[in-house]
Swiss-Prot record:
Signal peptide: none annotated. The gene is rplK. Forms part of the ribosomal stalk which helps the ribosome interact with GTP-bound translation factors. NCBIfam families: L11_bact. One of its GO terms (molecular function) is large ribosomal subunit rRNA binding. One of its GO terms (cellular component) is cytosolic large ribosomal subunit. One or more lysine residues are methylated. This is Large ribosomal subunit protein uL11. It comes from Karelsulcia muelleri (strain GWSS). The keyword S-adenosyl-L-methionine does not apply. Keywords: Methylation, Ribonucleoprotein, Ribosomal protein, RNA-binding, rRNA-binding. Part of the ribosomal stalk of the 50S ribosomal subunit. Interacts with L10 and the large rRNA to form the base of the stalk. L10 forms an elongated spine to which L12 dimers bind in a sequential fashion forming a multimeric L10(L12)X complex. InterPro entries: Ribosomal_uL11, Ribosomal_uL11_bac-typ, Ribosomal_uL11_C, Ribosomal_uL11_C_sf, Ribosomal_uL11_N, Ribosomal_uL11_N_sf.
Length: 140
């Protein structure tokens, strides 16, 4: 029998740290999903990325079963992590808060290209570089 999709939920959850508290509990509880079952499966799947903020797309079916897809961390979070910053610049065109090399931007683009809306590495690098510039990070 073919399962029909009841709801699709997009969340950002820290890897290995899912628990029934908000935002996970209310989002899944309203759809009738076993919250603890999701948390156990998610935490098991994200053991290697413990503590990193990971986007997840949860598909809930009519029989209250679910599946989920874990994506790469957001580009902005990866840039902040590599530059060892807490947040980006308030005025990115005037105040520069960090520096990053083109090689590091390329490595982020290679990891994130599967989640991006582009077809080649050159455009992915351009997107990551644009994000860095808008955060006030200087590209070397």
């Amino acid at each position: 029998m073919l399962k029909t999709i009841k709801k699709i939920i997009k969340l950002q959850i820290k890897g290995g740290l899912a628990n029934p508290a908000p935002p996970i509990g209310p989002a899944l509880g309203s759809a009738g999903v076993n919250i603890m079952d999701f948390c156990k499966q998610y935490n098991f799947s994200t053991q290697k990325s413990k503590g990193k903020l990971l986007p997840v797309i949860i598909t809930i079916y009519n029989d209250k079963s679910f599946s989920f897809i874990i994506k790469e961390p957001p580009v902005s979070k990866q840039l902040l992590e590599l530059c060892k910053l807490d947040k980006g610049s308030k005025e990115s065109n005037k105040i520069k808060v960090g520096k990053i090399t083109l090689a590091k931007i390329e490595s982020i683009a290679k990891n994130k290209i599967i989640d991006m809306n582009c077809f080649n590495i050159k455009s992915a690098i351009s997107m990551v570089a644009g994000t860095a510039r808008s955060m006030g990070i200087e590209i070397l």
